[in-house]
Amino acid sequence: MLIYKDIFTDDELSSDSFPMKLVDDLVYEFKGKHVVRKEGEIVLAGSNPSAEEGAEDDGSDEHVERGIDIVLNHKLVEMNCYEDASMFKAYIKKFMKNVIDHMEKNNRDKADVDAFKKKIQGWVVSLLAKDRFKNLAFFIGERAAEGAENGQVAIIEYRDVDGTEVPTLMLVKEAIIEEKC
């Protein structure tokens, strides 16, 4: 399995256990789903928790958690402050600079850096469109929540797929590293 980690904080943000695709060689999109499960239980995509012993509600006082499977599995923390467009703009400006600095420090080709700048600016403008921005949710990893700076904000957009609301997590490719586990 591949884990996708933040290059700045080392937070686990997603994994290849979720359906994913790379869009415009810029953003990984991971499809999640809403789940209800026992607190702390991790269910990998493709498994069948209802077929497992004890999956039915037995009326006990066990805590259950509800949410998006990607968020729960990777212990992401919701950041409501970014729901204000001006706060998000301030964050994304600093984040883009940090990613570009990281690319240059790692001797990335100038053409690659310039292409990234152009693509990321277009993507950010599309996110900030009023009809789209209001449907976004923002999450960070555990270390970023504990005060580690410069971490990537995982953005979830709720998309209509065949009449079903599908939470889609977006991560900037240049700000994550793949790690085999």
From Swiss-Prot:
Start and end residues of each TCTP domain: 1-181
GO molecular function: calcium ion binding
Main localization of the protein described in the UniProt heading: cytoplasm
Domain of life (superkingdom): Eukaryota
Keywords, sorted A to Z: Calcium, Cytoplasm
One of the Pfam families matching this protein, by short name: TCTP
GO cellular component, one term: endoplasmic reticulum
Function: Involved in calcium binding and microtubule stabilization.
Record-stated family: Belongs to the TCTP family.
Protein name as it appears in the record: Translationally-controlled tumor protein homolog
Species per Swiss-Prot/TrEMBL record: Caenorhabditis elegans
Taxonomic lineage: Eukaryota, Metazoa, Ecdysozoa, Nematoda, Chromadorea
